[in-house]
Every structure is written in C-alpha cells, then in structure tokens.
Amino acid sequence: VHAVCPGDGEIGVFNRSHYEEVLVVRAKGLVPESVWKKRYRHVNEFERMLSDEGTKIIKCLLNVSKAEQARRFQDRLDDPTKNWKFRAGDLADRKLWPKFQDAYDDMVRNTSTSYAPWHVVPSDHNWVRNLAVAKLLLNALKEMNPKFPPPEPGIEGTKIA
C-alpha cells in the first residue's frame, strides 16, 4: 500500500487495501490470531505516519445488510450484464457472514483513531451511501482548503504556436 499512497496535492482511493490483512485472513482462518491481531498496531502506525506527513485519511466502511447482499448477488446472477461481478467464492464467503461481521467490528474498534477515524456508512441504498461519502469528502476538502500549485517558473506568458 505504501508504494501507491498519494503524494503532495494528490488524492488516492483504496478499496480495502491493508485491511484485508485483518479481515479476510481472520474470517477465513488463513493465519493464526497472534498474526492478524498485531496487524491492528501495524495499520495504526502506518496511518499515524501518513497523518504526521500531512495526509488526510478518510476511512469509510460501506455497511451492507445480509438481506441486501443476497439481493445484489441474485441480481448479478440474473442479469447477464452483471454476471462479471459475481464469483463462486462469494457464496463461500457469505457462509462466513458472522465471522466477517466480528472481524469488521474489531477492525473498526481497533483502528479508528483521532487521526484516521472510521465512518460506518449505511449502504443498502446507493444514493444514501453516495451522499454520505460525498459529504465526508466535501467537508474534508473544505477543511483542507486546497490551492492550485504555482506555475513552473519561466512559463508565464508562453504562447503555443
């Protein structure tokens, strides 16, 4: 994740990223508790470093109910234009719903900090999710008050022929 973090003046969006290392590996039992549990500290230290260096971190947990997940999965199976979104492993993962929910709860509890808090966003309705996330981003940008960088020296007044 570190290699693809946004630089000064850039915005980056990550889908899951390093959180897979405390969610999937835990819910599926891929590594022992002693391994995934210490990763909370690793995540917090990494995000602390980013924050200390001036990165604004906005974390959104897009919370979809089990019933809505079932509806979306069925829609992906029934609609040929959405088949590409479905994979057989989704059904196996769905059977682990309680384990994933426990992992999500612990992840939020252990990695929500003053410098990188979690925002749990109700996401059964896309418009609600989109509005909530847009407001979070808009408020963050207003607070940051970004400015365009100055032009490169010597280009002022240049005319393209």
Where are the model-predicted features located?
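Short, surface-exposed amphipathic charged segments that create phosphate/polyanion-binding patches used
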Residues: V1-A3, D75, A134-K135
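Short, solvent-exposed loop/turn segments at secondary-structure junctions
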Residues: H18-E20, V64-A67, H125-W127
